A protein has these predicted regions:
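Glycine-rich phosphate/pyrophosphate-handling loop used in enzymes and phosphotransfer proteins
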Residues: 1-257
Length: 257
């Protein structure tokens, strides 16, 4: 099929497949209520959008949410004001809090790969929510997994999301543009403090793609401080990419950081 269909045709074909799948009666993957398509029921969809929209405050650059306390007047958090990230724009599907965080846990740690199409669709809707109009010359890639995590899981969660997202958007997917600079000595970012994350991420990636695409869409599953995406974006820009967009499934809010 890929031999005689353009990327745009493939994107439309996947939209048809997804539309047909939406008619199949299933249980909501979050609450168990009856729905269709193997995704969220209408109540959970509404709750998802409500939870993202009605937070106390959200940085317009890195999308970090403040779930309590005093509402801020400025649009950017202090880190974004003093240390701007390298990406052009960022879209986030939801905050990494209950109950939606359970979907990521099941997807990553219980090998529920059947959730990938729905999660990628949520990422696409996040891009629409932010008013993105992605360039036709954009190429999709994912943040690579550490070797230890790849051996443990058997798959890269970010790449699984990127595969479906690229299909939905009708964009090309490149799986080998970025690599970890120190895969053997690398330590999971989740075990580092914020300052350690940013220090470690300065030279965390090497560029393997040639020639570079004009515009790149970076895909990751969970954004904590933004150091990993920032480092990957810097690597891409330093090797000739003109603009870097980023989309993540979840963003850790300040109450958890």
């Amino acid at each position: 099929m890929a031999d005689f269909l353009s990327l745009g045709d493939l994107g439309r074909w996947w939209q048809i497949v997804d539309a047909l799948r939406q008619r199949i009666p299933t249980a909501c993957v979050l609450c168990g209520e009856r729905t269709q398509g193997g995704g969220l029921c209408s109540f959970c969809v509404a709750d998802w959008h409500y939870r993202y929209k009605y937070v106390r405050w959200r940085c317009q650059r890195c999308k970090v949410a403040q779930l309590g306390g005093v509402c801020r007047a400025q649009q950017l958090c202090q880190r974004c004001l003093t240390q701007p990230q390298a990406w052009h724009a960022l879209a986030v599907a939801f905050d990494y809090v209950a109950p939606l965080d359970s979907l990521i846990w099941r997807f990553k740690n219980y090998h529920q790969l059947r959730l990938a199409p729905m999660l990628a669709r949520m990422m696409q809707q996040a891009m629409w929510r932010d008013g993105w109009a992605h360039p036709t010359a954009m190429v999709v890639t994912a943040i690579p997994s550490r070797r230890q995590a790849l051996r443990r899981r058997g798959f890269n969660p970010a790449m699984e999301l990127a595969r479906y997202l690229a299909r939905y958007l009708g964009l090309p997917l490149a799986s080998d543009l970025l690599a970890l600079a120190q895969p053997k000595a690398d330590q999971a970012q989740k075990h580092r403090t914020q300052s350690q994350r940013w220090a470690h991420a300065q030279h965390a990636f090497i560029w393997r793609g040639a020639p570079p695409p004009e515009t790149l869409l970076l895909v990751d599953d969970v954004l904590t401080t933004g150091s990993t995406l920032h480092s990957a974006a810097c690597c891409a820009l330093n090797h000739g990419v003109k603009q870097v967009y980023a989309v993540t499934l979840a963003r850790v809010p300040w109450t958890i950081l």
